From Swiss-Prot:
It catalyses: 4-O-phospho-D-threonate + NAD(+) = dihydroxyacetone phosphate + CO2 + NADH. Homodimer. The lineage of its organism: Bacteria, Fusobacteriati, Fusobacteriota, Fusobacteriia, Fusobacteriales. This is Putative D-threonate 4-phosphate dehydrogenase. It comes from Fusobacterium nucleatum subsp. nucleatum (strain ATCC 25586 / DSM 15643 / BCRC 10681 / CIP 101130 / JCM 8532 / KCTC 2640 / LMG 13131 / VPI 4355). A divalent metal cation binds at residues 168, 211, 266. Keywords: Carbohydrate metabolism, Metal-binding, NAD, Oxidoreductase. InterPro entries: PdxA_fam (IPR005255). It comes from the Bacteria.
Length: 332
């Protein structure tokens, strides 16, 4: 049986519908897995015209009704977009509410094991708020709906997998958050997350300061917090090394020396992956009962409705979901 990937259509006023229909006609995807989109049929039909793709939108009530063949996109139509009021590139409460409902349905399917993974399209924080959806993004929504305490984000591009010790906080606060306890906790969590994907091997922890502090010469975080955490993790049996200078560790990961890198703050990991290949850097959410991959770009309101958006990131997100889904384990 072929892997089935659920895709929530995303914000109807953004580029989500366009990247969905472009992905659905990609030969790479047709050869790899089956897609089920949760969205609005009329929006997707309009997207096929905008993007000039030859694709029939086939409405289904459940996964079993799907026609998984070339030229057909199976859609669970929630019928929650008024085409008379839809405006591309605009913040609309209707669209934020609809985007949330698509995600919610995807989670239901994943929790019921009807699909093997979820690959998400962009949503807009302002639209969510306008639609009275009190979440700031996908990760928080997915965590809440799946009763997952703190989902873990990993970026992947080619041989490089990157986790984040801290994410959405100021750099000053991120430095203060680098404690022995937190580093040790994340080594444990990242190792568990890799096991969910069926990945084992040596993980590296990036350094914070230039040359990892040069034994305290350029900062003492490595000496006081990071190194003691790594040494404790090694005693507990974790296959981890570091801290390794951030100017070297990501290159070494690309060479295959490490299966993953724990970066210490948001931009440290983002710059490494996105400079290497912006479009093919994919976010994976782990430490949940199901696998989720995502494009790493926004709703692109400035080009929505024009048919010019690239679907490379969406195609890569689906490919990565299909790669890991067969071996994915819900490790508690």
């Amino acid at each position: 049986m072929r892997t089935k990937i659920a895709i929530p259509m995303g914000d109807p006023a953004g580029v989500g519908p366009e990247i969905v229909v472009k992905t659905a006609v990609s030969k790479e995807i047709l050869d790899l897995c089956d897609l089920v989109v949760i969205g609005d049929k009329k929006v997707l039909e309009k997207a096929t015209k905008i993007c000039q793709v030859d694709l029939k939108i086939h409405t289904i009530k459940n996964i079993e009704e799907g026609k998984y063949e070339k030229g057909i996109l199976n859609v669970i139509d929630l019928e929650n977009v008024d085409m008379n009021t839809l405006e591309y590139g605009q913040v609309q409460g209707m669209c934020g509410k609809a985007a949330f409902e698509y995600i919610k349905k995807c989670v239901e399917l994943a929790m019921e094991y009807k699909v093997d993974a979820i690959a998400t399209t962009p949503i807009n924080k302002e639209s969510l708020r306008a639609g009275n959806v009190n979440y700031i993004g996908h990760t928080e929504i997915l965590g809440d709906l799946s009763n997952s305490r703190d989902p873990l984000t990993m970026f992947e591009v080619d041989n490089m997998r990157v986790f984040f010790l801290t994410r959405h906080m100021s750099l000053r606060k991120a430095c203060d958050a680098i404690t022995k306890e937190r580093v040790l906790e994340y080594i444990e969590r990242c190792t568990k997350a890799l096991k969910q994907l069926g990945v084992t091997g040596k993980m590296a922890v990036a350094g914070l300061n230039p040359h990892s502090g040069e034994h305290g010469l350029f900062g003492n975080e490595e000496v006081k917090e990071i190194t003691p955490a790594i040494e404790e993790a090694q005693k507990l049996g974790y296959d981890v090394v570091g801290p390794i200078g951030a100017d070297s560790v990501f290159h070494q990961a690309l060479q295959g020396r490490y299966v993953a890198v724990l970066s210490l703050y948001h931009d440290q990991g983002h710059i490494a992956t996105k400079t290497y290949d912006f479009e093919r850097t994919i976010a994976i959410t782990l430490d949940m009962p199901f696998l989720r991959t995502s494009v790493d770009h926004g709703t692109a309101f400035d080009i929505a409705g024009k048919g010019i958006v690239s679907a490379i990131s969406m195609i890569e997100a689906v490919k990565l979901a299909a790669k890991y889904a067969p071996n994915f384990k819900n490790i508690k």
